[in-house]
UniProtKB/Swiss-Prot annotation:
The protein's name in its UniProt record: ATP synthase subunit b
Molecular functions per Gene Ontology: proton-transporting ATP synthase activity, rotational mechanism; proton-transporting ATPase activity, rotational mechanism
UniProt-annotated location(s): Cell inner membrane
Residues marked Required for proton pore formation, as well as F(1) to F(0) binding (site): 131
Length: 156
């Protein structure tokens, strides 16, 4: 093998080129690659955190929705109970009012009936006395007539 100056010059030039690249070209390339790797790793970590946060937010929203539905159901049940209670109270009050009005009306009817009966008795007594006077055409005795009228009124 023949070593000549050209091969030796090329070898020295290649070694110098490699040293130059290792000194000035390689570090910025490695720094750029490491920076890009770090950005990608940070992006992936951020995406993972965002995904976990999203899952937590979904779970929290689901829990809050369940709680809100439960509270709404409780409120609806309370409103229904209150509505039933108000209706029952109104029915009871209406029944009491109806009973009171019926009793008052019956009392008024009874009083009117008694008054009408008494008025009728008085008119019958007057008609009986008038009829008796016309039949007899004269009064026998005022005391006897009043006894007869009282007996007649008592019989009615």
């Amino acid at each position: 093998m023949n070593l000549n100056a050209t091969i030796l010059g090329q070898a020295i030039a290649f070694v110098l080129f490699v040293l130059f690249c290792m000194k000035y070209v390689w570090p910025p390339l490695m720094a750029a690659i490491e920076k890009r790797q770090k950005e990608i790793a940070d992006g992936l970590a951020s995406a993972e955190r965002a995904h976990k946060d999203l899952d937590l937010a979904k779970a929290s929203a689901t829990d809050q929705l369940k709680k809100a539905k439960a509270e709404a159901q409780v409120i609806i049940e309370q409103a229904n109970k209150r509505r039933s209670q108000i209706l029952d109270e109104a029915k009871a009050e209406a029944e009491q009012e109806r009973t009171k009005i019926v009793a008052q009306a019956q009392a008024e009817i009874e009083a009117e009936r008694k008054r009408a009966r008494e008025e009728l008795r008085k008119q019958v007594a007057i008609l009986a006395v008038a009829g008796a006077e016309k039949i007899i055409e004269r009064s026998v005795d005022e005391a006897a007539n009043s006894d007869i009228v009282d007996k007649l009124v008592a019989e009615l």
